A protein has these predicted regions:
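Extracellular glycan-modifying ectodomains
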Residues: 1-355
Length: 355
């Protein structure tokens, strides 16, 4: 009887402690590790109660705002990885401390559709331009196959693009990179490791890049990338480096959406939810880097995804301006309202997830 009383008291104490923690816990607006907003307490109404929506929304809210939620996510991930020996958690796997996300299914129809879209852009705006395209290899290209993980059929993707883009010149970047050239906790490549890749792009375009020895390397020490939160593993932060020089400091970036003019690096973004946004301020539909000290009067248009943010500053040396266009955020039909197409060099540069 005494043992049962002690057990019951322990259970009641645990429940009481849990209830007290929930009461005292302050609701958080977002999860920094997952980089997403958290559900907030739903409003009570007769309509919401009658429809059942309130309980459904409250369940989501309770799961998001559970006081020990982050600790439980980490515990689950460690059990799956290290105790149960599962090869991934939430689709994220780990090889020698580097995280990557499984992407195994190549949508050939999507690749063909992307090629058709690029062709339409070339026919509409770029008939007087030299046009190049390249694929930014994802980290899986260097990690997945040799470590037993499924991966995209990169050769098939390249073949579809080559067939679909007959009037563009391909820039091959696969042999310019390795797994070590990417952040351990993020899908993006590391700017300080792009000398070979940037040189390959510049060579194709017929321009030069500044030697990396000319740059000063600035460092943010507390970078935790997108895969850090998705994996839920308690990994150490890693450094994020960005390259500066007097030439880059003289450049300005015009953001068409806001009308703001900034520097190439927006260092205040380092304190935000995604420090990678330090490169050109992060996601932006349309922006132009102006270089007052350019060695030529040439101009470059880069149709890109987020990988282009850290590469573009390395290409400005010979260009009077470099305009970056992200078609995920602006319709191609609106481009001529902002850009005077007159034979600029053109580069389409996307990672496999966009193609």
């Amino acid at each position: 009887m005494k043992k049962e009383t002690i057990t019951a008291a322990a259970v009641l104490c645990a429940l009481g402690a849990g209830f007290l923690a929930c009461v005292l816990h302050t609701d958080q607006p977002l999860s920094l590790s997952e980089r997403r907003p958290l559900a907030q307490r739903p409003e009570v109404s007769v309509q919401a109660l009658a429809s059942g929506n309130y309980m459904s929304e409250f369940e989501t809210y309770a799961l998001d705002q559970f006081p020990l939620r982050e600790a439980m996510r980490q515990l689950k991930a460690q059990v799956q990885y290290y105790l149960l020996r599962q090869k991934d958690n939430n689709g994220v796997y780990q090889v020698d401390g580097s995280l990557s996300k499984i992407e195994a299914v190549l949508s050939e129809s999507s690749v063909r559709a992307a090629a058709e879209k690029l062709n339409r852009l070339q026919e509409t705006y770029l008939t007087d331009s030299r046009v190049f395209y390249g694929v930014v290899p994802d980290k899986n290209y260097y990690l997945a196959e040799e470590n037993g993980y499924p991966h995209l059929d990169y050769e098939r993707m390249d073949a579809i693009l080559a067939e679909g883009l007959p009037h563009m010149e391909r820039i091959d970047l696969y042999d310019c990179l390795s797994a070590e050239d990417y952040y351990k906790t993020d899908p993006h490549w590391r700017q300080e490791e792009l000398e070979k890749a940037a040189g390959r792009v510049a060579q194709a375009l017929g321009v030069s890049i500044a030697p990396f020895s000319d740059y000063t390397q600035e460092t943010y020490q507390d970078f935790r990338g997108a895969y850090y939160g998705q994996s839920a593993l308690p990994l150490k932060a890693e450094p994020l480096h960005y390259l500066t020089s007097e030439a880059l400091e003289a450049c300005t970036v015009h953001h068409y959406e806001t009308g703001a003019d900034t520097g190439v690096y927006e260092t205040e973004k380092l304190a935000g939810k995604d420090p990678y946004d330090v490169f050109l301020g992060g996601a932006d539909a349309l922006e132009t880097i102006t270089n007052p000290n350019a060695k030529t009067d040439r101009e470059l248009l880069v149709f890109r995804d987020s990988f282009g943010s850290s590469l573009a500053p390395l290409l400005v040396q010979d260009y009077q301006s470099v305009t970056l266009i992200d078609l995920r955020y602006v319709s191609a039909q609106l481009l001529e309202q902002f850009i005077d197409f007159h034979g600029q060099d053109v580069l389409f540069l996307y990672s496999p997830s966009v193609y």
